[in-house]
Amino acid sequence: MSDLISYDDVIDAAYDIFLEMAPDNLEPADVILFTAQFEDRGAAELVETGEDWVEHVGFEVDKEVYAEVRIGLVNEENDVLDDVFARMLISRDPEHKFCHMLWKRD
């Protein structure tokens, strides 16, 4: 296996993919909200890889090779990312690019 992509680079890649795909996958009101409030409250953060990914991608997820990034808005009162617009599973292996996103649904 090749060297894995750093977690910082995973977060950057996830955010770039999110920005590209958000207009086609989120409600227009959510896109406007995220865009308007990202400067003050926006976040893309690495979290513990969820156990439910196997149900979404159809294979066992190696938590060393794959990372989960959540993208959304942070609650200013408790500094918690509680308005999640997307969850992304992304491969850290540069030889096997892969990502799968779960989008916020109202």
UniProtKB/Swiss-Prot annotation:
Secretion signal, residue range per the UniProt entry: none
Pfam families for the chain: DUF440 (PF04269)
Taxonomic superkingdom: Bacteria
InterPro entries, sorted: dsDNA_mimic_put, Put_dsDNA_mimic_sf
Entry's family note: Belongs to the putative dsDNA mimic protein family.
Record function comment: May act as a double-stranded DNA (dsDNA) mimic. Probably regulates the activity of a dsDNA-binding protein.
HAMAP family associated with the record: Put_dsDNA_mimic
Name by which UniProt lists this protein: Putative double-stranded DNA mimic protein VP1949
Organism field: Vibrio parahaemolyticus serotype O3:K6 (strain RIMD 2210633)
